[in-house]
């Protein structure tokens, strides 16, 4: 009660103090207004007095009026001065009263502080009055399951296993799941899943779940032990964990692919040569070829891609065993050439032999350096794979060079040498020349010709043939002892007759970057310059 009364007294004192302050402010405003009026009247009185002193021509009535006006102004000035003094006295009285009210307020505040209780006292009193009651959990009455508790179906499966006498089954599949658990929220997040081989899986860690079909073991993280022990997992938690692991694995599956190179045709794998190059086969890919170099016809697959050419050493004693689908490209040299071969034993070894079925003999003496040096396009590649031995082979004359018997330079130095038993020079413009060339070709069935379109030279060892080829500029070379074509065949007809649709010939070879092979481009330009009937 005392505290309430003191609070009322303090509130009343504050209210009175506020009113006194408002009265003081109003009176001060009035004093300012009175002072302004007083100042104005004094100035007016001095002006009129100055006018009266300077004007002596006024009548008596006017002078009387001026005197009465001056007296009225003097009275008003006195009244304003007295009013100002009174207001100042009232302000002084109000200020004294305000001081008394402030003093009374301070006294009431001191008494109130002595009587009023602090916040801590109030809290203590409230706590003393209110009794604390213990919180009752709804699950407090349910006892916790013991660690040795097992579900009924687990016990039944164990008992059935014991009765049957079967040994414990081995794990068929194992997976390592890395889980991060938030202590505050209790949520588990699957970070990664790693399949583990069941043969390498060992029962490590603490078993937290086992229902006879699935077993879960808790492992310690790297460098840290488990916090507050390990609790067993409920079946619901296990299913949720497996579901999250499955989702995590399906989000970013592991994909395997072959190595990708920035330049597909600029670098090859070790021990492998691209089939678009010179066609040297790896010894591991030579299926259907015996150790003696004999090709088995049944083991030869049907080529579905552009054929390769295998480079093997000559001579070839087993040439008769090779499939008849390939043209015979070996040349029977004359006696002078044989003598030259005896002096130069390396000439025959540098020759090429064509095998159209992408197979060939592999010689260990064949160094990898020679394979890398001869990776560009060769004229031997241009021979189709489906030619018949009974049909003549038409070739394009690109130039010639004399090859004397005593020439010290071996003809094998020229790239793409082809040896033929019969060479017939045909001129389409003159039928008589065709017959003469045919006769001359029959008389010289053992002549040796070396053709190299890539280097734009043709080596012919027979002097008779040298005389006959000086005249024409557009000629065809026919092999295998057959009559030449009377009329030149078009490129499309020749491709159709040689099975172009099934086996593409190398003169249509396109590089992987979309451009034609440079050697083929040069060959086409040279053909265009020879005349209108060049194949």
Curated annotation (Swiss-Prot):
Localization annotation: Cytoplasm; Cell projection, Dendrite; Cell projection, Dendritic spine
Record key words, sorted: Cell projection, Coiled coil, Cytoplasm, Synapse
Biased composition, class Basic and acidic residues, residue ranges: 437-446
GO cellular component, as recorded: cytoplasm; dendritic spine; membrane
Stretches assigned to coiled coil: 1-105
Annotated family: Belongs to the paralemmin family.
Name of this chain's protein: Palmdelphin
Species in which this protein is naturally found: Xenopus laevis (African clawed frog)
Protein encoded by which gene: palmd
């Amino acid at each position: 009660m005392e505290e309430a009364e003191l609070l009322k007294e303090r509130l009343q004192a504050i209210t009175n103090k506020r009113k006194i302050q408002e009265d003081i402010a109003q009176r001060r405003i009035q004093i300012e207004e009175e002072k302004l009026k007083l100042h104005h009247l004094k100035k007016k009185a001095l002006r009129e007095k100055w006018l009266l002193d300077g004007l002596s021509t006024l009548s008596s009535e006017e002078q009387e009026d001026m005197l009465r006006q001056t007296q009225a102004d003097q009275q008003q000035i006195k009244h304003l001065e007295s009013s100002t003094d009174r207001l100042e006295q009232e302000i002084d009285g109000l200020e004294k009263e305000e001081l008394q009210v402030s003093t009374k307020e301070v006294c009431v505040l001191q008494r109130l502080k002595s009587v009023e209780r602090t916040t801590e006292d109030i809290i203590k009193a409230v706590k003393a009055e209110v009794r604390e009651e213990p919180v009752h959990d709804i699950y407090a009455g349910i006892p916790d399951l013991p660690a040795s508790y097992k579900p009924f179906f687990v016990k039944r499966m164990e008992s059935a296993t014991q009765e049957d006498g079967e040994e414990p089954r081995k794990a068929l599949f194992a997976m390592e799941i890395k889980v991060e658990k938030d202590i505050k929220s209790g949520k588990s997040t699957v970070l990664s899943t790693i399949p583990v081989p069941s043969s390498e899986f060992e029962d490590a860690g603490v078993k937290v779940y086992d229902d006879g079909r699935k077993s879960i073991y808790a492992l310690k993280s790297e460098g840290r032990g488990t916090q507050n022990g390990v609790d067993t997992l409920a079946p619901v938690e296990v299913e949720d964990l497996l579901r999250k692991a499955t989702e995590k694995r399906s989000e970013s599956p592991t994909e395997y692919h072959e190595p990708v190179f920035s330049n597909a045709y600029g670098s090859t794998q070790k021990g492998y040569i691209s089939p678009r190059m010179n066609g040297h086969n790896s010894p591991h890919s030579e299926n259907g070829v015996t150790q003696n170099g004999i090709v088995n016809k049944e083991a030869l697959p049907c080529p579905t891609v552009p054929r390769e050419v295998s480079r093997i050493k000559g001579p070839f004693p087993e040439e008769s065993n090779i499939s008849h689908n390939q043209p015979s490209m070996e040349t029977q040299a004359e006696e002078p050439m044989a003598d030259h071969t005896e002096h130069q034993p390396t000439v025959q070894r540098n020759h090429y032999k064509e095998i159209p079925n992408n197979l060939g003999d592999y010689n260990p003496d064949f160094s990898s350096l020679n394979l890398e040096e001869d990776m560009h396009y060769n004229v031997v590649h241009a021979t189709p794979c489906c030619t018949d031995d009974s049909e003549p082979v038409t070739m394009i004359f690109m130039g010639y060079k004399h090859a004397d018997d005593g020439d010290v330079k071996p003809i094998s130095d020229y790239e793409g040498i082809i040896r033929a038993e019969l060479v017939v020079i045909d001129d389409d413009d003159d039928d008589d020349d065709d017959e003469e060339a045919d006769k001359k070709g029959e008389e010289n069935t053992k002549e040796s010709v070396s053709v190299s379109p890539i280097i734009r030279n043709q080596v012919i060892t027979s002097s008779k043939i040298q005389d006959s080829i000086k005249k024409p500029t557009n000629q065809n070379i026919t092999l295998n002892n057959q009559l030449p074509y009377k009329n030149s065949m078009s490129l499309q007809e020749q491709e159709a007759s040689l099975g172009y649709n099934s086996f593409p010939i190398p003169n249509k070879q396109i590089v992987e970057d979309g451009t034609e092979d440079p050697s083929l481009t040069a060959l086409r330009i040279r053909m265009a310059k020879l005349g209108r009937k060049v194949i």
